[in-house]
Amino acid sequence: MSNPIKIGIGGPVGAGKTQLIEKVVKRLAKEMSIGVITNDIYTKEDEKILVNTGVLPEDRIIGVETGGCPHTAIREDASMNFAAIDELLERNDDIELIFIESGGDNLAATFSPELVDFSIYIIDVAQGEKIPRKGGQGMIKSDFFIINKTDLAPYVGASLDQMAKDTEVFRGNRPFAFTNLKTDEGLEKVIEWIEHDVLLKGLT
């Protein structure tokens, strides 16, 4: 059984977590063996969405119904996600990379370091220019931070420049990107981070 790298994807409901996984997997699945675990409170809606996109065979995607508070299942009691990892590896023992999508949660949600090796936190512009200024733990502690749906900025009166400045205050030099996942704008920066910082491509 392999020991795959695990990347957690966190963020509020509707920020673009599932779409991010779809886009990234579509790019990376040609080069490596990938699995996905989704967390939803009472349904397996995100699992169904990913299955319907066809980015991976159905046996490489597992939906976890967390119940209650979704952040508990990725931090305080991650047993359901550990079980899902074991099941994925029993189905496909060649898996090299697993994405674990959290249920939509608040800005304070973070992944247990025992569950994932790296984490990405994603918000969207429509949630307000002030979100990066709030400095939630998900944004501050994640290895990579994404501000999605940049095309909506003019409609909600958000300044991307101000959001970038506020992000840099809390994250320092830690990487982040603006994206519009609908058009793939900014996706390349996310892919590059995964390839170079997570998969260590190009290092000898």
From Swiss-Prot:
Which GO molecular-function terms appear in the entry? GTP binding; GTPase activity; nickel cation binding
Q: What CDD domains does this protein map onto? A: UreG
BP-aspect Gene Ontology terms: urea catabolic process
Q: Where is it located?
A: Cytoplasm
What the entry lists under InterPro entries is as follows:
CobW/HypB/UreG_nucleotide-bd, P-loop_NTPase, UreG
Would I find Repressor among this entry's keywords? no
Keyword Chaperone applies: yes
State the GO CC annotations.
cytoplasm
Query: Of which family is this protein a member?
Result: Belongs to the SIMIBI class G3E GTPase family. UreG subfamily.
Q: What does this protein do?
A: Facilitates the functional incorporation of the urease nickel metallocenter. This process requires GTP hydrolysis, probably effectuated by UreG.
Q: Which PANTHER family match?
A: UREASE ACCESSORY PROTEIN G (PTHR31715:SF0)
What is the name of this protein?
Urease accessory protein UreG
Q: Which organism is it from?
A: Staphylococcus epidermidis (strain ATCC 12228 / FDA PCI 1200)
Name the gene. Answer: ureG
